Amino acid sequence: MQNNFQLIKNIFINFILILIASVFSIFLLELFVNSFLPQFDPRGMVAYQVNDEGVPLLKYKNQSMRQWKNTGDYDVSVFSNELGLRNHKDIKTNYIDAIYVVGDSYSFGQGVEESERYSDQLEGLIKKPIINISIPTDFQGYDRLINYAIKNGANIEELIIGVCMENDLRVYEDINKGDKKDSFIRESIHFIKTKLTEISALYCFVTSVVHGNRILSKVAKNIGIISKNEAYDLASSSALMNSKKKTLLSSVKYLKIIREKYKIEPIILIVPSRSLWLGNNINQADEIHKTFISMLLTENFLIIDPRESFEKGGTPMDYHFKYDGHWNAKGHQLVSSIIANQIVKNNLKKF
């Protein structure tokens, strides 16, 4: 009995010693990376928050932040104005004939400088002020962003809504339903990874090394530690394949709600899903893409779809970052020219 107690005691003591040594080692490594590899310092990185009214915004206001991807895709500056939006313009200013842009991370300009976004390049092409109020979110978030901008003095008469075909389409009536256990696990993992990215230089360094090494990256993807960003599989990450009709109807309905609520005839900019060109659901993605646009046209929405231009050269993924998947500067430049040409071609004087 005495021997068993002593054995348990020794195991416990050894465990505590190993734990203390591990924590101390991690602490030293964190200090080392912070001191000698400042490019991995997470301080000042882009962060988001939802305000008391449910509006998604940049967390820090009136300052520039850094948006960095551990895959090496980008390292850019993001300025947040006094309202928590990525725009140097003051929306309270009475800009004549201003066009507002709302959308998710593509329209926000993830991975590119503010001046490289399609909205900012469009301003130079059509010689009209463009005010971008985009934040990574969905139709519900776009609705709240438009309302937030109006409450803060914006006069929105002309609007472009960037619709991301990868994650904007959903059954909005069921947005708070679903598998709570599965959702909790996914959200918990995402929360932990996000927090580590925000506070740990060591985590940023390690993930960068993993992404940069072909073997380590493959192992990490196979066990699910990192996402397979370069081959986005629409069917595996949404319920679209199982409830396509319901999802598309609900998505079109929400866009109609926005149009009627704010008395605006928006241009709908389609952000094509990468599943059109990658993964195992190319045919399904093609069907969804065409069906959704057809439904929008039936409801008399103005549509701009850059898909054909992306595919024209045969290498549509050249307009996206290699790993992150968002549009790169080349993609934004192409989209800005497409929008400008469509505005001129269709004689959209309002725009």
Feature map (PLM): residue ranges:
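Generic structural signal for small/hydrophobic residues in well-ordered secondary structure
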Residues: 30, 104, 159, 259, ...
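Membrane/wall-proximal cationic-aromatic binding patches
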Residues: 37-131, 144, 232-235, 310-314, ...
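Conserved SGNH/GDSL esterase-like catalytic core that processes O-acyl groups on lipids
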Residues: 108-184, 190
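N-terminal Lys/Arg-rich, disordered targeting/topogenic segments
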Residues: 1-10
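Short, amphipathic alpha-helical "lid/cap" segments that border enzyme active or binding sites
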Residues: 139, 143, 245, 249, ...
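Serine-dependent acyl-ester chemistry module
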Residues: 166-293, 306-312, 316
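Hydrophobic membrane-insertion alpha-helices, especially the h-region
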Residues: 14-32
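Catalytic His-Asp segment of secreted/periplasmic serine-dependent ester chemistry enzymes
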Residues: 275-278, 283-351
